[in-house]
Amino acid sequence: MGLHLTVPGLRRDGRGVQSNSHDTSSKTTADISRCPQHTDAGLQRAATPGISRLLGISSRSVTLTKPRSATRGNSRYHWVPAAAGWTVGVIATLSLLASVSPLIRWIIKVPREFINDYLFNFPDTNFAWSFVLALLAAALTARKRIAWLVLLANMVLAAVVNAAEIAAGGNTAAESFGENLGFAVHVVAIVVLVLGYREFWAKVRRGALFRAAAVWLAGAVVGIVASWGLVELFPGSLAPDERLGYAANRVVGFALADPDLFTGRPHVFLNAIFGLFGAFALIGAAIVLFLSQRADNALTGEDESAIRGLLDLYGKDDSLGYFATRRDKSVVFASSGRACITYRVEVGVCLASGDPVGDHRAWPQAVDAWLRLCQTYGWAPGVMGASSQGAQTYREAGLTALELGDEAILRPADFKLSGPEMRGVRQAVTRARRAGLTVRIRRHRDIAEDEMAQTITRADSWRDTETERGFSMALGRLGDPADSDCLLVEAIDPHNQVLAMLSLVPWGTTGVSLDLMRRSPQSPNGTIELMVSELALHAESLGITRISLNFAVFRAAFEQGAQLGAGPVARLWRGLLVFFSRWWQLETLYRSNMKYQPEWVPRYACYEDARVIPRVGVASVIAEGFLVLPFSRRNRVHTGHHPAVPERLAATGLLHHDGSAPDVSGLRQVGLTNGDGVERRLPEQVRVRFDKLEKLRSSGIDAFPVGRPPSHTVAQALAADHQASVSVSGRIMRIRNYGGVLFAQLRDWSGEMQVLLDNSRLDQGCAADFNAATDLGDLVEMTGHMGASKTGTPSLIVSGWRLIGKCLRPLPNKWKGLLDPEARVRTRYLDLAVNAESRALITARSSVLRAVRETLFAKGFVEVETPILQQLHGGATARPFVTHINTYSMDLFLRIAPELYLKRLCVGGVERVFELGRAFRNEGVDFSHNPEFTLLEAYQAHAGYLEWIDGCRELIQNAAQAANGAPIAMRPRTDKGSDGTRHHLEPVDISGIWPVRTVHDAISEALGERIDADTGLTTLRKLCDAAGVPYRTQWDAGAVVLELYEHLVECRTEQPTFYIDFPTSVSPLTRPHRSKRGVAERWDLVAWGIELGTAYSELTDPVEQRRRLQEQSLLAAGGDPEAMELDEDFLQAMEYAMPPTGGLGMGIDRVVMLITGRSIRETLPFPLAKPH
């Protein structure tokens, strides 16, 4: 099925495109074929991949998507308008054919006479009636209510006539059959039409009936007089006294009078002419009668004010949003007022301008309101310039989306004139600068009135069309006080004369969108490039982070059709576009934008049915100003008279009659309570707490006051003397109310205590006031003296209290707490508030970090900080995280280890140095791994890896002592007994000396066969096969040994053990062993299957270090994402000589895991959680 679409030039102002002429026009026509391969699998799919590759068409060339749901057809009588329209349309077609063809008239004579006599008016050879029936059929199909009324009246009148004939009697059997059949058909038709009344919802203009009658009467009079004159000139055999009556019968009587009533007849050709006169009169009358309501196409001040408010609140994402304030549009709002759609009505098409404006959550409501408006007046819905998100919303409402082209977006942070791809722009800018041009950039508010008037005059004089073009991507005005935030860019020659200008509208608060581009005939080549480049290069000082340029229609077709190996269809499609570009600048627009290396953002057109595509195309051409109809109001000042804003929004008094933006804070407050299904929905318990907060505020109580330090913590208060005066602050965890006495549990970081509120002890108020004002979870400040309850429980006897923080959400169940591990991670703040174990883990982690630092400080180590953002990833073999710095336009890596920078410090003479900080590795997340973790790296000059065995053990034992009070580690245990499975933590003594074993000895013991550093690769592979250990064929012997170690030794280790002397090939930063060949001086510390740390005798030979890093860089170049890159700066530093050094690396998170017996997710305050 072919779709022929006429598309207007969707861009701001193409006349500013650099070309051989100083001014250009914009018009784009395209012919698109919809193939059966097109599916509705999404906005980016155009054809099956196989066909696309075969023909050379990309899925971005043309995108057609089917709607997910229809907007009509839910009623059981939805078929009535179409059935009525088709029935009347068939009769109209046959009547028209019979009017021009005697043969067809002879063939259908019998059924035509039967239908005409008993069912429906079907006269012989009457153009007028044929056209009237055609217009009636079209109006019925369009669900026009006036058409329903006309058809119903016809059926009622015909039924009455048939009933009268039946009642009169005296008819032949054939006539009686026809009259009875006709009466039955009429009754059924009347019943169906009455039942289908609600399906005819489209309104017509007010007073359409009287206007239609006047048009018909005037046309009929003119037609009768003209026909009478023709009969007098060419009477044929018609009697002179019957000529006027014959002409009137043919023109306005639908030839209802039998031709045999007249004496003689004129030539048959005159009958056709008379019918045309009648047809013209009736067509004009029918058009006026069935014409849809015409929109005012104008915004009121309140409408514009509301749109500006929505843009301030939600307009940061839509580059075309500001164009919604164009005043020759109408607007329809969602009932909540949180979103709206601006549109124009042309040739019966309601053409929406881009995306809805406002809250994305309210877009569907705005689209529904717009579609209901279209249905009410019988308009065909259409959309021009929708974004991907907007097109998806329209699609879900039942429309079909078609990709038109791409919008060019510049990111000033990435823009630069250097580089081969910017050569053309750079040369053009150089030419303009040599011509003495400079650029001036100002906001419209900074331009004086007289100067702005000159600017408007220049813009009009440099325009080569009589009317200002644009609709969805143009503002249509310049110098309006309401547009003070718009940006004006001017090119000025050495004589201070303006030679070109760009006007850009706001795009949120940090962007601008091109509206107007004009240049003088005397401007040199490169003027536009100079202005765009200067704007991009100085954008930061203007607070601009994004610039929207022109729109390139069918951009993907130009790009893909020019590619090497493009298919025949792609090349043919591009060739057609290039051909039409001679008139409509399609390729010029694409190339003028492409040279800036922009980001291309697709834009879509949407329509309801393929049959209305030509109408949507014509409407868009008219709206964009490429086709100016007679009596067009395009150049008039557009001021609406009937605001479209919802009553609830208008009643707030926030909107301004002059169209200026309303108070945004006021809109937020209104939006919180007036949402239409998009307001913040709160659970019942939360709503109750919010209501209590409002009551407190209305009573003058500040629920979130300024703090003041308490005199005691809870623990200190419990240890204080009896009757001691104290003030404590904490969270209410439990309340027990006994009337005049109230007990509450108060918790702070140090512990939990009971507070007692007795009416007789309170300085003011009563316990009931406390109970009414507070909820579980509230933060309160209590003042009183220490005492005891009747049961002897130490308690704070409260004399005064103050609410210092209202908890607006209920705490978890006080008995079960947070059971879901994911919930505990995502709401760690809540976990800490209710879970004593979580607070203990935070304290233990702090104790471990403090103990590690104090141990190193005691040995004379210096703590430093090295860069987290690094230009190369090195120091370890791991996959890094990559980010980007805009200033230098280069990628950076989050460090995987600080090693190489710490060694630079060692070269500089820092003999004992450590860093305790964050490292990042883009690897798995499990029990012992988190992408972001805390790492300790320490280096000691004049030492080796053996010295760090004692140093590492001391660090961990001291950390355990600080966290647990003794050198013990907590191990999770599971005991199965008669009462079920019980999980608990068991302390394990880690004091004393820990075992030390070589890697090869440990593997040999696990295999039951001796291996060493000289064992060949083939033997190692056989041992792997026998043990079921996987390996890669490109690995050397050292990598295979490491894999055996990880599978057979590391994961089976229980007590803390040092494994020493790893193969050299897997230790690129480690010096070779001083006495053993093939191994390096490195050890790993393992406990209960987890590696805790590693230490090296650092490689200080710069020549050997370079060789090993070059091997690593080759692996990286070969695609290994974990291999280290060659760091020339580090190697150069090493060439200045680094003292013999021993280095330690230890995972602090895993040490905390060892000491506390918890997983890494439990010991980290905020581990990485999966997205919701």
From Swiss-Prot:
Query: Could you say which residues bind Mg(2+) 2 here?
Result: 1091
Q: Which gene encodes it?
A: lysX
The name this protein goes by in its record: Lysylphosphatidylglycerol biosynthesis bifunctional protein LysX
Q: Where is this region: Disordered?
A: 1-34
Q: Where does it localize? A: Cell membrane
Q: Which PROSITE patterns match?
A: AA_TRNA_LIGASE_II
Q: What does the UniProt function comment say about this protein?
A: Catalyzes the production of L-lysyl-tRNA(Lys)transfer and the transfer of a lysyl group from L-lysyl-tRNA(Lys) to membrane-bound phosphatidylglycerol (PG), which produces lysylphosphatidylglycerol (LPG), one of the components of the bacterial membrane with a positive net charge. LPG synthesis contributes to the resistance to cationic antimicrobial peptides (CAMPs) and likely protects M.tuberculosis against the CAMPs produced by competiting microorganisms (bacteriocins).
Mind telling me which NCBIfam families this protein's record contains?
A: lysS_bact (TIGR00499), PRK00484.1 (NF001756), PRK02983.1 (NF002821)
Q: Name one GO biological process term.
A: response to antibiotic
Q: Which GO terms describe its molecular function?
A: ATP binding; DNA binding; lysine-tRNA ligase activity; magnesium ion binding; phosphatidylglycerol lysyltransferase activity; tRNA binding
Question: Its domain of life?
Answer: Bacteria
Query: Pfam families under this entry?
Result: LPG_synthase_C, tRNA-synt_2, tRNA-synt_2_TM, tRNA_anti-codon
EC number, as in UniProt: 6.1.1.6, 2.3.2.3
Instruction: Read off the InterPro entries from this record.
Output: Aa-tRNA-synt_II, aa-tRNA-synth_II, aa-tRNA-synth_II/BPL/LPL, LPG_synthase_C, Lys-tRNA-ligase_II, Lys-tRNA-ligase_II_N, Lys-tRNA-synth_II_C, NA-bd_OB-fold
Q: Quote the HAMAP family the UniProt record gives.
A: Lys_tRNA_synth_class2 (MF_00252)
- Positions of the DNA-binding region: 726-804
Principal localisation: membrane
Which cellular component appears as one GO term in the record?
cytosol
Q: Which organism is it from?
A: Mycobacterium bovis (strain ATCC BAA-935 / AF2122/97)
Q: Which PANTHER family match?
A: LYSINE--TRNA LIGASE, CHLOROPLASTIC_MITOCHONDRIAL (PTHR42918:SF15), LYSYL-TRNA SYNTHETASE (PTHR42918)
